[in-house]
Curated annotation (Swiss-Prot):
GO molecular function: ABC-type vitamin B12 transporter activity; catalytic activity
Task performed by this protein: Catalyzes amidations at positions B, D, E, and G on adenosylcobyrinic A,C-diamide. NH(2) groups are provided by glutamine, and one molecule of ATP is hydrogenolyzed for each amidation.
UniProt pathway: Cofactor biosynthesis; adenosylcobalamin biosynthesis
GO BP terms in the entry: cobalamin biosynthetic process
Domain called GATase cobBQ-type: residue spans: 251-444
Lineage start: Bacteria, Bacillati, Chloroflexota, Chloroflexia, Chloroflexales
Pfam families the record matches: CbiA (PF01656), GATase_3 (PF07685)
CDD domains reported in the protein's UniProt record: CobQ_N, GATase1_CobQ
Keyword Transport: no
The name this protein goes by in its record: Cobyric acid synthase
Organism: Chloroflexus aggregans (strain MD-66 / DSM 9485)
Source species, domain of life: Bacteria
Keyword RNA-binding attributed: no
Family: Belongs to the CobB/CobQ family. CobQ subfamily.
Length: 491
């Protein structure tokens, strides 16, 4: 018999679906259930790499970690990676499928329904419970005919479905009741409960709100989840970095350039969680004032990002910048002398002069490198421990002359290798590499921060697992009885 499915849908994007699924995965795993997350289709440039080299959304990989299992492509069989100019690379079952304009994908997406059901069925045959996540709103009426991620999944799996609204953005009654009103009757009958998320203050003050929602909908409110600060889990959408933070008077501030089609910006979450470190996202050269370091992040379209940097006036600003300059993946490519795309891998192709801050050149090829990777640092402050991360890139970068490498790669997937990666300037101020997840490695992160003059204000070890913190928070809001019924441990 296929495993039951619990599904979390939301009234809009960024209402907390991903974090709630992560919490439920951890809470189910604590009860001894073999549980897996599932999201049929995701749109994000924040990608993770599975053990077999497939790509899935990082938010799904976090949910798998919450469940205590390794992520697989079955958990997120369709990943849309926007490239700009209304085009996206479509990843199907972990591998590049096609690069399509929005209209072309819309016309073809219903063909992918079989991919969705095949992978969901495989998870249901393997695990005791699957916790699925929707995307955006399930009642975008102009898009509903092509739905392969929201209520079509719920109906197919006959899922116990939860509807989540975000009270912090206001209009919680319109959010929840309006969504219910627009669902088809066969869809509405699957809704087992409502969740009011991100309540600031005492939830007891919303007792009347709970009563109104239950009276008008006939559906129980399973919990009012209070706002939780500084959770530190990977964000799915770039909307999470739209609000910048000021340069702090104490500690150090690191600027990350908010490039168009920025990718894998959760690379910098470990830096932001350190005491005495502020990470701010910038898009103007004037915002470099007072920061200790600037990071050029990964990006989905490197040549377009290069032109954007030039148009914004970053070329001269970065050349004059006295602090540390770092590039990760696409950012590493941008730091070099030249970027070439003779096969139009990124769309229109072309050839661009880089920022010229590192003696490297990049050429794009049609084969995508997607691996879980282990490396050693070749710099004294990088520590002795192996560095664990992942690679996702279609560029091949080589150093010019006697330039020094930053890392030695010793393993890709299950294969032992011995290959240099990255580059560092003679004075150590400018460096870059392809390894995402570099700053999750404590020795490397702390070593680099100390190079910037960082002095931790509290202990840098023994932090609480953010997933456990989140799970405890959600468990308090929903209660053990609700959770047991949801997971079908009791009826």
């Amino acid at each position: 018999m296929p495993a039951p499915v619990v599904m979390v849908i939301g009234t809009a994007s960024s209402v907390g679906k991903s974090t709630l699924v992560a919490a439920l995965c951890r809470l189910a795993a604590r009860r001894g259930l073999r549980v897996a997350p599932f999201k049929a289709q995701n749109m994000s440039n924040n990608a993770a790499v599975t053990a077999d080299g497939g790509e899935i959304a990082r938010s799904t990989a976090v949910q798998a970690a919450a469940a205590g299992i390794a992520p697989t492509v079955a958990m997120n069989p369709i990943l849309i990676k926007p490239e700009g100019q209304r085009r996206s690379q479509i990843i199907v079952e972990g591998r590049p499928w096609q690069t399509l304009a929005a209209g072309d994908f819309w016309r073809r997406k219903t063909l992918l329904w079989e991919v969705v059901t095949r992978n969901l069925d495989a998870l249901r045959a393997t695990y005791d419970l699957v916790i699925a996540e929707g995307a955006g709103s399930p009642v975008e009426l102009n898009l509903k005919a092509g739905d392969i991620v929201n209520m079509r999944v719920a109906v197919y799996a006959q899922a116990r479905t939860l509807l989540v609204g975000d009270i912090d953005r206001g209009g919680i009654f319109a959010q929840l009741l309006g969504t219910l009103m627009l669902l088809d009757p066969t869809e509405r009958q699957l809704i087992q409960g409502l969740i009011v998320n991100r309540f600031r203050g005492d939830p007891a003050l919303f007792v009347d709100g709970v009563r109104i929602l239950e009276e008008r909908s006939g559906i129980p409110v399973l919990g009012v989840v209070p706002w939780i600060e500084d959770l530190g889990l990977a964000e799915e959408d770039a909307v999470a970095i739209e609000q910048s933070t000021p340069v702090m008077a104490q500690g150090i501030t690191i600027a990350v350039i908010r490039l168009p089609t920025i990718a894998n910006f959760d690379d910098f979450d470990p830096l932001a969680r350190e005491p005495g470190v502020t990470v701010r996202y910038i898009d103007r050269p004037g915002e470099l004032a007072g920061v200790a370091a600037v990071i050029i992040p990964g990006v989905k379209h490197t040549i377009a990002a290069r032109r954007w940097l030039r148009e914004r006036g970053f070329d001269e600003a970065l050349r004059r910048f006295p602090g540390a300059i770092v590039g990760i993946c696409g950012g590493y490519q941008l730091l070099g002398e030249r970027i070439s795309d003779p096969l139009a891998v990124e769309g229109n192709g072309g050839d661009e002069v880089g920022l010229g801050l590192l003696p490297v050149e990049t050429i794009f090829v049609t084969t995508k490198q997607t691996t879980q990777t282990v490396a050693h640092a070749r710099v004294p402050w990088g520590g002795q421990a192996p560095l664990h991360g992942y690679e996702i890139h279609m560029g091949r970068t080589h150093r010019i002359g006697a330039a020094s490498a930053l890392l030695t790669i010793i393993q890709r997937g299950a294969q032992a290798v011995l290959e240099e990666d990255g580059c560092i300037s003679p004075d150590g101020r400018v460096w870059g590499c392809y390894l995402h997840g570099l700053f999750t490695n404590d020795e490397f992160r702390h070593g680099w921060l100390r190079q910037l003059g960082w002095q931790p204000t509290t202990s840098v070890s023994g932090s609480v697992d953010p997933i456990n913190r989140l799970a405890d928070h959600v468990a308090r809001a929903l209660g053990e009885t609700v959770l047991d019924r949801l997971f079908r441990l009791t009826e």
